[in-house]
Design a protein with these regions (language model features):
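Gly/Pro-rich interdomain helix-loop hinge
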Residues: 1-76, 118-119, 124
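Short, amphipathic C-terminal "tail helix"
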Residues: 75-126
Length: 126
């Protein structure tokens, strides 16, 4: 989700005025700086922040994927469209810096299930 939000050319921005232009990458870089994570540029700092978060998740016992929690693939895929719709309709979604398209939410769920990383150019088009 951090990589998704940090896009410098999102398909759709969030609805609040503070999201009138992409600046999330720079904000994540500020967090990395505050934590002393290093990096030569904002993208490198973002990757260092993600690495630190993943290390913390491992330390506290959060599994890497939805699949790792024993969720059956068939059941997951059967419920995927409903989960996407509920996530899209959730009141908090509009407060996200980057407002996701339903196809993007679906891809994020699939990535979370299979343990894939977000890559901007691999995101499905609406």
């Amino acid at each position: 989700v951090l990589r998704f939000n940090a896009s410098e050319a999102p398909a759709k921005m969030g609805t609040f005025s503070q999201y009138d232009h992409p600046h999330t990458l720079a904000r994540y870089a500020e967090i990395a700086d505050f934590l002393g994570l290093g990096g030569k540029n904002d993208k490198e700092k973002l990757e260092n922040l993600i690495k630190a978060i993943n290390e913390l998740k491992e330390t506290v016992g959060i599994k890497k994927t939805i699949k790792d929690y024993g969720v059956d693939e068939k059941v997951f895929l059967e419920n995927l469209d409903e989960m996407v719709e509920q996530a899209f309709d959730d009141q908090c979604t509009g407060a996200n810096p980057r407002y996701p398209l339903m196809s993007e939410i679906k891809q994020m769920y699939l990535n979370a299930y299979y343990g894939k990383h977000f890559v901007e150019n691999e995101m499905p088009k609406a």
